[in-house]
């Protein structure tokens, strides 16, 4: 069982460096960063991970751009894997995005994870001039573009949104045959996307039981796509808060679905349960405010949970 952590994307260079260096020293598999370009004043009712769709963040909360942050994180570390959880694929030109990931993979020594999703915040799409209704087909085509650019000597793809031919795309990623693609989402469409394009189903804000209930469909769709289900790993990302950790106050953020808010022993039991269900990787973000408190929770996680995960293999 592998465990990664999600970093707050706050404009605190020293804090980000300390978080990444500490995560690497503690033995976590990965540090991941989320993706938003803008957030709407007044919140939204579209958030897919709360019963009412409510998602309220401070309107002036600063979020660093994801690819820029991953480059900084790569320079702060030497071994830990780095990735997006998840990058909203329709927001950026796919050829440029593929180039950025390939460049970071080369510069980091082959440590990148390409976590992708379709997005959910319609206002953000409107501001960026991207058609919200097309986000699914765009994501599928962009993933096909990534695969062509990363694996073909002379990439070719004739799609609805982009036509690619007569070019070289260099350098290729260090990782072969390509940078691992972690497909986010919790719908049947996301599972079919994983089956066709992904190396990992990286669902978020769900329960372990939800994951287990959907694994038969994922395996079925993977076989229909002509691929071996054993080649696709399963990752679950959730918010984590230890209720018995001294000096750790739960933050003010939205309690999204699947949050793990419990004692240390209950978290240990949950890791065992996830392993029994066939989940290969867990990514946690922390329900505390600020990078300093996040580091404290991460250290508690490393002390009490990482050894359990390592014994599970």
Identify the residue ranges that each predicted region occupies:
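Active-site-adjacent structural elements that line small-molecule/cofactor binding pockets in enzymes
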Residues: 1-313
């Amino acid at each position: 069982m592998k465990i990664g952590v999600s970093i707050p994307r706050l404009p605190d260079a020293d804090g980000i460096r300390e978080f990444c260096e500490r995560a690497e020293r503690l033995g976590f598999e990965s540090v991941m960063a989320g993706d938003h370009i803008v957030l709407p004043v007044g919140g939204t009712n579209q958030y897919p991970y709360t019963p009412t769709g409510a998602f309220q963040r401070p309107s002036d909360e600063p979020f660093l751009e994801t690819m820029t942050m991953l480059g900084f994180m790569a320079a702060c570390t030497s071994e830990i894997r780095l990735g997006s959880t998840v990058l909203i694929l329709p927001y950026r030109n796919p050829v440029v995005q593929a180039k950025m990931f390939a460049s970071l993979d080369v510069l980091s020594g082959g440590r990148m994870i390409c976590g992708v999703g379709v997005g959910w915040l319609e206002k953000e799409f409107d501001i960026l001039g991207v058609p919200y209704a097309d986000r699914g087909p765009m994501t599928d085509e962009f993933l096909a573009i990534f695969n062509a650019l990363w694996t073909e000597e002379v990439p070719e793809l004739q799609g609805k949104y982009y036509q690619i031919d007569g070019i070289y795309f260099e350098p290729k990623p260090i990782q072969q045959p390509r940078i691992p693609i972690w497909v986010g989402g919790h719908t049947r469409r996301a599972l079919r996307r994983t089956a066709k394009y992904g190396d990992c189903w990286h669902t978020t804000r769900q329960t372990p039981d939800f994951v287990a209930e959907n694994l038969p469909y994922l395996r079925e769709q993977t076989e229909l796509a002509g691929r071996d289900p054993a080649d696709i790993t399963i990752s679950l990302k959730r918010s984590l808060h230890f209720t018995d950790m001294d000096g750790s106050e739960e933050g003010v953020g939205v309690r999204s679905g699947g949050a793990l808010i419990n004692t240390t022993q209950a978290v240990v039991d949950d890791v065992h349960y996830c392993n029994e269900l066939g989940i290969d990787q867990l990514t946690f973000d922390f329900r505390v405010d600020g990078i300093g408190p996040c580091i404290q929770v991460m250290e508690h996680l490393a002390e009490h949970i990482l050894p359990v995960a390592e014994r599970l293999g």
